[in-house]
Amino acid sequence: MTTPVAFEYPAAAAGLTEPLVRQVVLSFYEKVRGDAVLGPVFAAAIGGDWDPHIERIMLFWLTATRLKRGYHGRNFMPAHLKNPAIRPDQLPRWLELFRETAAGQCTPQAASALVDIAERMAETLAIGLKRRDAAP
């Protein structure tokens, strides 16, 4: 009889923990709020009450890293596509802030695991936004 091999997600193997992911997410969104490019887009979409959004995003990231199961929301794409203020040219800035935050708070291995997830999200969102913007 063979022993099943447990699948270990790269983020967990990279040394990510729930407190670290929470710290990165909170720090990242503080930067976003103060950013000249992204701040106004997020402020218009979220309004004045950031707490519910932050908690939803926190659960998303904890689920994406497989540190916790708790995000039961929809795919992130529809909410972003319906907002015309979100444009593909903003994604490099979003990634720049995320990379900066992860690098400043994580080991290189943990930062790489988080940035990998962020890059895949940005790539997927860029494709969707370009299709949206090309639609007649």
Regions found by a protein language model. Name each.
Residues 1-136:
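Core of compact, soluble alpha-helical bundle domains
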